[in-house]
Amino acid sequence: MNKAKRLEILTRLRENNPHPTTELNFSSPFELLIAVLLSAQATDVSVNKATAKLYPVANTPAAMLELGVEGVKTYIKTIGLYNSKAENIIKTCRILLEQHNGEVPEDRAALEALPGVGRKTANVVLNTAFGWPTIAVDTHIFRVCNRTQFAPGKNVEQVEEKLLKVVPAEFKVDCHHWLILHGRYTCIARKPRCGSCIIEDLCEYKEKVDI
């Protein structure tokens, strides 16, 4: 895909959604961090249902520590992998209190040192909480970038590297959100909704379907 096509795709996505954001509910960097930790192999809807009950009780590292692992589990049992997630949350809260004055660090290395936090989670937090021009690549974005040929790659690392290289600076902060929403609602895994796609004429997917 050439530069002009990519620019037009990003321009249309921006025109369609000028102020995109995550569908996870949060009101602080800490709430976002916990929500993203919970979102692995879970839907944003299921995470939001759990945090709607959890956050009124505990939305700081200290309050979460008071709940303890078993206490956290009672609020997140509807989410997959809740046992390991509860343990990671408590370990993370302890580190935040002991090493970061109870604050979520605006630092990639410090974030990735937290239990359960990998590059993708760190990218989401840095981008959505702190406005960094990072681009977290999940399954939706991986699919969209390969299917459209916007930024093809054999794995998420290659796709992220390509995106950071080809996406102009003015689009970088919002790019993650545009692509994930496009993959979640239009360029879906099975039977993509090409007929209602705003970038269908620019897409290089060879098996486009007019639905």
Curated annotation (Swiss-Prot):
**Disulfide bond annotation, renumbered to this chain:** none
GO molecular function terms here?
Answer: 4 iron, 4 sulfur cluster binding; class I DNA-(apurinic or apyrimidinic site) endonuclease activity; DNA binding; DNA N-glycosylase activity; DNA-(apurinic or apyrimidinic site) endonuclease activity; metal ion binding; oxidized pyrimidine nucleobase lesion DNA N-glycosylase activity; uracil DNA N-glycosylase activity
- Could you tell me which residue ranges the HhH domain spans? 108-127
What the record notes about the co-factor is:
Binds 1 [4Fe-4S] cluster. The cluster does not appear to play a role in catalysis, but is probably involved in DNA-binding and proper positioning of the enzyme along the DNA strand.
- Reaction catalyzed: 2'-deoxyribonucleotide-(2'-deoxyribose 5'-phosphate)-2'-deoxyribonucleotide-DNA = a 3'-end 2'-deoxyribonucleotide-(2,3-dehydro-2,3-deoxyribose 5'-phosphate)-DNA + a 5'-end 5'-phospho-2'-deoxyribonucleoside-DNA + H(+)
Q: Required co-factor?
A: [4Fe-4S] cluster
**Subunit structure, interactors included:** Monomer.
Q: Which family does it belong to?
A: Belongs to the Nth/MutY family.
Q: Which HAMAP family does the record match to this protein?
A: Nth (MF_00942)
What name does UniProt use for this protein? Answer: Endonuclease III
Species annotation: Escherichia coli (strain K12)
Taxonomy, top ranks, is: Bacteria, Pseudomonadati, Pseudomonadota, Gammaproteobacteria, Enterobacterales
